[in-house]
Regions:
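Hydrophobic alpha-helical membrane segments
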Residues: 1-168
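Phosphate-group recognition and catalysis centered on beta-loop-alpha active-site segments
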Residues: 102-109, 120-419
Length: 419
C-alpha cells in the first residue's frame, strides 16, 4: 500500500480536482470502496470457462464474491483488533516493556498479513499446498523481523536525539487544551494560553453574509429550535449572539476581529484556517488580507486552508503572510509555489513527504495528534510540530522524553508504517 501511495504521489493532479476530492473526501472514500468491490464482483462474474483457466475448481461467481468479501472482512477486523489493543496496552506500559509489546504487536501484524496473502493465493488458484507453507514462512519472517528489530533498536539507541524541547512545536487545535472549554472561542483561547502557552493556537474562520469573518468550524449552525442554517447566510451580529455548548461548557461565538485582538493582547501567535464551501466567493481571501494581514504579520500569525485557491489568492494579496496547505491525506503530488508549510493528517504522514517538504524549505505540522505514540511517530519522521487537542499532556511528555522513547518512535515508524 505505501508503494501505491508513493506512485500516486508522483502523478500531477490538477489543483481543482484535488480541491474537489478534499472537499468531498468522505464521499470520495465511499466511491473508492464501492469501486473496489465492483471490480471484485466483475472479476467474480467471468464465465465458467474463464474461471476454469484461473481456478483448479470451478466456483460460482456469487460464492466466490462472498468468500472474497468474508476474507477481506476478517483481515480488516483482526487488523483493527491488533491496532486497538496495541494502542491500549501502550498507555499502560513503561520503558522496555513498551518496546517488547510493540515488537509483539508488529510481529503479529506481519503474520496476519502473510496469512491473508496465502489465503488469497489459495482462493484464487485453489492450491492447498500453501497451507503447509504458512507456518514455515511465518516463522522465517518472524525470525528475520526480530533480528532486524534488535539491530534497529541498537542503532537508534546510540543515535542522537533531536532537541524536542526547542524545535518541536505544539499547536493547540481550535485553541483548546483537553476539555478546557468550547473550541474556537475566546474563553478557551485565554485558558489555553494560561495553562499551556502553545507555540501556536489554531482556529477556523468562515465569511458571513455581510462580508465579515466569524470564528467557527462547521458550515451549519443549529438555532434554538434545532433548525440548521448555513453560516454564510447569517450576519456576524446574528452569529455572535449564539451560545455554543459542548462537553459541559458554554460560550458565545466571536468575530475574528475580537478573537485576533484578544490573541495579540495575550501574545498568542495564531494559525488561522480559512474555511470555504461551494457557495463562497474566492475574493474573500483579498478581503481577509485587507482587514487582518498587517496585524497578523506584525504578531507572527499564519494562515492555512484546505482550498489551494485560497492560499494562492492570499499570497497574491499579501506575499509576506505565511500560508499553509491543509492535506486530509497525502497520496497526490506535492503542489509547489505559494505554500510556506503543510498541515497533514497523521494517518498518512510519512518520512518521504516530510523530507520532500524540507528540501523545499517548508515546514510540516501533523494533525490531529492526541496521544504519545502518534507524537513519537511524528518526531521520528521529522515533523516540525503537532496540532493537538491535548497540548499540556504532550508538552509534559516531550519535556521528559528519553532516548528510549524516541527509539520507540523510530522503530514504530520503520516497521509499522513501512514508509
Amino acid at each position: 500500500m505505501p508503494f501505491i501511495f508513493r506512485a500516486l504521489s508522483q502523478i500531477p493532479i490538477p489543483i481543482a480536482i484535488q480541491n474537489a476530492i478534499f472537499d468531498h473526501r468522505r464521499q470520495f472514500i465511499l466511491i473508492v470502496v464501492c469501486c473496489f468491490f465492483g471490480m471484485v464482483w466483475l472479476f467474480c462474474s467471468v464465465s465458467d470457462e474463464t474461471v476454469g483457466v484461473f481456478f483448479s475448481k470451478k466456483i460460482k461467481s456469487k460464492r466466490l464474491f462472498l468468500r472474497i468479501l468474508l476474507l477481506e472482512t476478517e483481515f480488516i477486523f483482526w487488523s483493527a483488533f491488533l491496532f486497538a489493543i496495541g494502542y491500549w496496552m501502550y498507555g499502560h506500559l513503561l520503558g522496555n516493556a513498551q518496546f517488547l509489546w510493540e515488537i509483539l504487536i508488529l510481529m503479529l501484524k506481519w503474520i496476519l498479513l502473510i496469512m491473508y496473502q496465502m489465503a488469497c493465493f489459495q482462493l484464487y488458484f485453489g492450491n492447498r499446498s500453501f497451507d503447509s507453507r504458512v507456518s514455515e514462512i511465518s516463522g522465517s519472517v518472524t525470525i528475520c523481523f526480530l533480528i532486524a528489530a534488535v539491530v534497529q533498536l541498537i542503532f537508534v539507541k546510540n543515535s542522537l536525539v533531536p532537541n524536542l524541547q526547542s524545535d518541536f512545536k505544539i499547536v493547540a487545535h481550535r485553541g483548546s487544551d483537553g476539555n478546557n472549554g468550547v473550541p474556537n472561542t475566546v474563553p478557551t483561547l485565554k485558558d489555553s494560553k494560561k495553562k499551556l502557552s502553545p507555540d501556536y493556537s489554531e482556529l477556523d474562520v468562515r465569511q458571513t453574509v455581510d462580508g465579515r469573518f466569524v470564528v467557527i468550524h462547521d458550515a451549519m449552525l443549529a438555532n434554538s429550535s434545532g433548525k440548521e442554517r448555513e453560516v454564510n447566510n447569517l450576519s456576524l451580529g446574528d452569529l455572535i449572539e449564539h451560545k455554543v455548548k459542548e462537553s459541559g461548557h458554554a460560550a458565545y461565538l466571536s468575530g475574528y476581529s475580537q478573537y485576533l485582538e484578544v490573541a495579540h493582547q495575550i501574545k498568542q501567535p495564531l494559525i488561522t484556517e480559512i474555511k470555504t464551501d461551494e457557495h463562497d466567493n474566492y475574493d474573500l481571501a483579498a478581503e481577509f488580507c485587507h482587514l487582518y494581514a498587517d496585524s497578523m504579520i506584525d504578531h507572527g500569525d499564519m494562515v492555512h486552508s484546505m482550498d489551494y485557491r485560497i492560499i494562492v489568492n492570499v499570497k497574491k494579496s499579501e506575499k509576506r503572510l505565511k500560508c499553509g496547505y491543509v492535506l486530509p491525506f497525502e497520496i497526490f503530488s506535492m503542489p509547489k509555489g505559494a505554500i510556506d508549510f503543510y498541515s497533514i493528517e497523521y494517518l498518512t504522514m510519512n518520512r518521504s513527504f516530510i523530507k520532500a517538504a524540507h528540501d523545499q524549505k517548508k515546514k510540516v505540522y501533523v494533525w490531529t495528534v492526541n496521544n504519545k505514540l502518534d507524537c513519537l511517530r511524528a518526531c521520528a519522521i521529522g515533523a516540525d510540530g503537532v496540532i493537538t487537542d491535548n497540548g499540556s499532556k504532550l508538552k509534559r511528555f516531550l519535556k521528559t522524553a528519553t532516548k528510549d522513547d524516541f527509539s520507540l518512535g523510530c522503530f514504530i515508524n520503520s516497521y509499522a508504517t513501512l514508509k
